Amino acid sequence: MYIVQIASECAPVIKAGGLGDVVYGLSRELEVRGHCVELVLPKYDTMRYDQIWGLHDAYRDLWVPWYGGAIHCSVYCGWVHGRLCFFIEPHSGDNFFNRGCYYGCPDDNMRFAFFSKAALEFLLKSNKRPDIIHCHDWQTGLVPVLLFEIYKYHGMENQRVCYTIHNFKHQGFGGPEILWATGLNREPYYFHYDRLRDNFNPFALNFMKGGIVFSNFVTTVSPTHALEARFGNYNYGLGHTLYLHQHKFRGVLNGIDYDIWNPEIDRFIPFHYTAQTLENKAKNKKALRDQLWLQDVDKPIVAYIGRLDEQKGVHLVHHAIYRSLFKNAQFVLLGSATEPGIGAWFAHEKRYLNDNPDVHIELGFNEELSHLIYAGADILVVPSHYEPCGLTQMIGLKYGTVPVVRGVGGLVDTVFDRDYDTRKLPEQRNGYVFYHTDRAALESALDRAIDLWYTAPDQFRQLQVQGMSYDYSWNYPGKEYLEIYEFIRHR
């Protein structure tokens, strides 16, 4: 099959979060399976040009219809770790992608509405006719709308769209100006409850809702999160829309790239290891202590790696630090705050605990250090308030770092409680799970993990081995997506 991914991110060249990893990992898996995959991305001024090989002009004179006129664009082509990528650069006074950032501009809705239009215009004018167009999150929610309302009448009638929602919280909103700009000129038609009109605000268009309504198939990033979105509180107002389109909605668990996250070959850790050579994990633990100036004592290391925000359960992350110390464990935190107040809170904790030889708080993100923490820590806490998929716990399992997670979203699909999970046999369980968002719930799981490390080291090692035996690569998700592609291709 010929597959084109249209997205706002692709790691490592454009990466603001997990979306970039997913777009790259899925593309790579599809190519390994023998399919032709190309990516269409914005040409941001801040993307990592050092990660692109052979960047050159591919289409110099792309004129994208916009507000009754047209904006001139250049399309550049280059290879990102073997993936063929096209980068769209508009030449206009709006400077849509020359802002010094990927997201966070007041006109993000207009920026990505233009990108969606430009991506389809590029496919049309360059005579690219993929079997499948796979687009991601609200930034490309208008792609299926534009394809089936405009471009199918210009020679793109045979293309099918798979639309993946990575986070329902961010949906993308706009007013009538979006319709005027993109050429969707029938305002009363699109401002209808079963098309683009937002379910709560009758004066707003909802990009994500448009993606759901007009695409051929909709996925989200784990089976449990699909259920939460359909029946729970994590759809942020799109529950009824998902109900109307439940026949084409499914959760597909993300994978992780084992060429990057693999203790057997990881270039960022000093000692490689497997489930059969876990003694080398202990050597990485010592290396981690030496680098972070933790005291070299016989204690478990509990770690947290990720954003510091409400979604990630930041109040429980904070409590995990002090609970670990109370249970005679060490704690390592690597995280970046998205809100100034949370950043100031953890900066204060860093200063307060600076002289404690059992704690290290590293604010910001450090790719190399994250690998060493996964390899050196014994326990990984993931106390998310909600978690559509989560990659952290999958990486932890691969590195033999026992996850302690809250039972939501993709965490439910990947971590099985050692003591209580009835879905798996005892020899298939791989971590600890709690369900409520209070401190006592976290303690109930974290204490069991630390106690097992102290009282039954052989059983703790066996739990590590069981976690490392799980395959959370892109192998199975790639197969699922190909089944979806084949299904919609012949509809």
UniProtKB/Swiss-Prot annotation:
Q: Which reaction does it catalyse?
A: [(1->4)-alpha-D-glucosyl](n) + ADP-alpha-D-glucose = [(1->4)-alpha-D-glucosyl](n+1) + ADP + H(+)
Could you cite one Gene Ontology molecular function of this protein? alpha-1,4-glucan glucosyltransferase (ADP-glucose donor) activity
Does the record bear Lipid metabolism in its keywords? no
Q: What is its EC number?
A: 2.4.1.21
Q: In which pathway does it act?
A: Glycan biosynthesis; glycogen biosynthesis
What is its biological role? Synthesizes alpha-1,4-glucan chains using ADP-glucose.
Q: Give the protein name, as stated in the record.
A: Glycogen synthase 1
